[in-house]
Amino acid sequence: MKMTCILCNGMLDEYSKESNLDLSINHCKNCNLYISGNTKQEVIEKVSELYKGDYWNEHNSETSINSEYTDVDSQGKRRNWVSQFLYTKQYITGKTLLEIGVGAGQSILWFEEEGFDVSGIEPDGRNVSMINKVLKRGKVAETSVEGFSSDKVFDVIWMSHVLEHLIEPVRFLKKIRNNLKKNGIFFIEVPNCEYEPMLQSSIEKNPHLYHFTKKALTKMVEEIGYKIVSCGIFRPATKSEGMRHKILKNSFPYYPRIMTDVHSGRDLRIILKNS
């Protein structure tokens, strides 16, 4: 059966016949959400094919871990994480943290170094084994994101550039609410696909199943029952802004990322609480 919008159940218009996953891209004008594929079964088959191939070999964390996260990729992620943490820390009231999609393990280690009691999930068993050797107290479990199940509750749930990869993001966001403490926060960052260059990158260069705009993401989380604490669009700082920041320390509160508008920012961030 042809897919409809996961938010309003409305009909979709074809946006593009091509994508990184060789799936067509469809668009809901009502929700401003871009969706990969024409049927759920088609999407499941493409994702299964992707992860059975060389995907995990190409995303191995060994280089990053062996460099103690001094490699170029990790340093770029460090700059983004610093900004994310500055954006969220005023809302954090406890120290238990669950990271959804640990990747190479940079963020979960940096949170542990900040004194958090960290847990994480990651589908690549090789990465999990290496990351667990780096963490002093924290633990990463090998499981798919959508297959995750736990009775534990956390002060912070952290999900950076993972939601766009899920087959059923609404179902996942409903389920993970049970793992968030009453006064806890849920941080999500995704590509800002209202910014045209990022939309094209999300479609053409990455195996993303959903391509979110601010309207689509906020509608999704509110309909599930989350309360939006903060939502913003961010871009990397320019060199001149970096110089200004060195002189005037309080110029950019989330440096080295700068808050901007939906048509010029790379990343879309949202902080949620259970309503």
Task: Report the location of each language-model feature.
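Conserved N-terminal segment of class I S-adenosyl-L-methionine
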Residues: M1-S160, V170-L173, G232-P236, G242, ...
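A short His-aromatic
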Residues: H161-H165
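A short glycine-rich, Lys/Arg-flanked "PGG" loop and its adjoining helix->strand segment in the class I
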Residues: V170-I185
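Short N-terminal helix/helix-N-cap motif within the alpha/beta-hydrolase-1
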Residues: I167-R171, M198
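Short glycine/proline- and charge-enriched loop/turn segments
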Residues: N66-E68, P197-N206, H245-S251
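Short, glycine-/aromatic-enriched active-site segment of Class I SAM-dependent methyltransferases
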Residues: F187-M220, P236
